């Protein structure tokens, strides 16, 4: 069994692609011929490792090479203010793949990372094998829940007023069972958030510059790659009806819903998630 560490898999790749011109941090693990790229969400202090540390070993053990990309403006990647957001994050991923000589990979994205994965499928379909999106994908507003949701309000409030108190408020509704969040995880997230204050202010500026998240709902019928949509029934950040919209719109999609699950399916139900997605990729 693998024992991948953050430090042992860490590398930096200089990327010049579109509006991206800087150093992108990547955790690169495994040496399989098939590659899986994982994209993190948008919460303050988010990183590829913090989002997917419960998943990377299982995928490497199954024979995949795994890339956890810190999107520009997050964690160890270079700071940026971007108007296109998803477009810039996809450009960064393309640049990383090009530098590493990877022509095609499966894309897995959580929340904002789901929108990044979808943007990869829109802009660079030839580089995308299968697509997996959890609690995200950027297909407009909910028809069942007032927007922005309580979770997104807390997230944006944390960016504007970063503190341990506000972080705990957000994390309390981030997962179904907040008692499962360890002090080590919470403290690590706080330290990561406060280590790069420029990322926090830049994210707020990017929100203003972009005018909100893009809506790819009209493009769903063109995304023909096999797709698995995964949602938490109890997600208080991105409502489940958006997953249903994606299911209805994409030609080759399936939806799996975890009960007793919030916005972090790959962490809250890691073992089941790993097996579900590995089975999907192996078909």
Curated annotation (Swiss-Prot):
Keywords of the record: Aromatic hydrocarbons catabolism, Hydrolase
One annotated Gene Ontology cellular component of this protein: membrane
Pfam families found in the cross-reference section: Abhydrolase_1
Gene3D superfamilies: alpha/beta hydrolase
Entry EC number(s): 3.7.1.14
Site (Catalytic role in ketonization of the dienol substrate (substrate destabilization)): 189
Active site: 263 (proton acceptor)
GO molecular function, one term: monoacylglycerol lipase activity
A GO biological process held by the record: acylglycerol catabolic process
The reaction(s) this protein catalyses: (2Z,4E)-2-hydroxy-6-oxonona-2,4-dienedioate + H2O = (2Z)-2-hydroxypenta-2,4-dienoate + succinate + H(+); (2Z,4E,7E)-2-hydroxy-6-oxonona-2,4,7-trienedioate + H2O = (2Z)-2-hydroxypenta-2,4-dienoate + fumarate + H(+)
Top EC class, one word: hydrolase
Annotated site, Transition state stabilizer, chain positions: 111
Pathway the protein takes part in: Aromatic compound metabolism; 3-phenylpropanoate degradation
Entry annotated with the keyword Hydrolase: yes
Function: Catalyzes the cleavage of the C5-C6 bond of 2-hydroxy-6-oxononadienedioate and 2-hydroxy-6-oxononatrienedioate, a dienol ring fission product of the bacterial meta-cleavage pathway for degradation of phenylpropionic acid.
Similarity comment: family membership: Belongs to the AB hydrolase superfamily. MhpC family.
HAMAP family in UniProt: MhpC
Protein name: 2-hydroxy-6-oxononadienedioate/2-hydroxy-6-oxononatrienedioate hydrolase
């Amino acid at each position: 069994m693998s024992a991948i560490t953050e430090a042992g898999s860490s590398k930096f790749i200089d990327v010049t692609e579109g509006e991206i011109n800087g150093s992108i941090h990547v955790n690169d693990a495994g040496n399989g011929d098939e590659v899986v790229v994982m994209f993190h969400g948008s919460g303050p202090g988010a990183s590829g490792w913090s989002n997917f540390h419960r998943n990377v070993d299982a995928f490497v053990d199954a024979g995949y090479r795994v890339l956890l990309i810190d999107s520009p403006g997050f964690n160890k990647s270079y700071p940026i203010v971007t108007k296109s957001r998803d477009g810039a994050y996809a450009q960064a991923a393309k640049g990383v793949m090009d530098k590493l000589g990877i022509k095609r990979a499966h894309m897995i994205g959580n929340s904002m990372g789901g929108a990044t994965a979808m943007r990869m499928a829109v802009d660079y379909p030839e580089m995308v094998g299968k697509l997996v999106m959890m609690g995200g994908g950027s297909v407009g507003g909910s028809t069942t829940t007032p927007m922005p949701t309580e979770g997104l309000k807390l997230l944006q409030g944390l960016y504007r007023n970063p503190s341990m108190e506000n972080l705990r408020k957000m994390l309390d509704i981030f997962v179904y069972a907040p008692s499962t969040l360890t002090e080590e995880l919470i403290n690590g997230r706080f330290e990561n958030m406060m280590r790069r204050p420029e990322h926090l202010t830049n994210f707020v500026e990017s929100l203003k510059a972009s005018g909100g998240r893009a809506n790819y709902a009209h493009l769903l019928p063109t995304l023909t790659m096999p797709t698995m949509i995964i949602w938490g029934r109890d997600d208080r950040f991105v409502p489940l009806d958006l997953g249903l919209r994606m299911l209805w719109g994409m030609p080759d999609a399936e939806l799996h819903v975890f009960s007793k699950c919030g916005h972090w399916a790959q962490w809250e139900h890691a073992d089941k998630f790993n097996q579900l997605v590995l089975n999907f990729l192996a078909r």
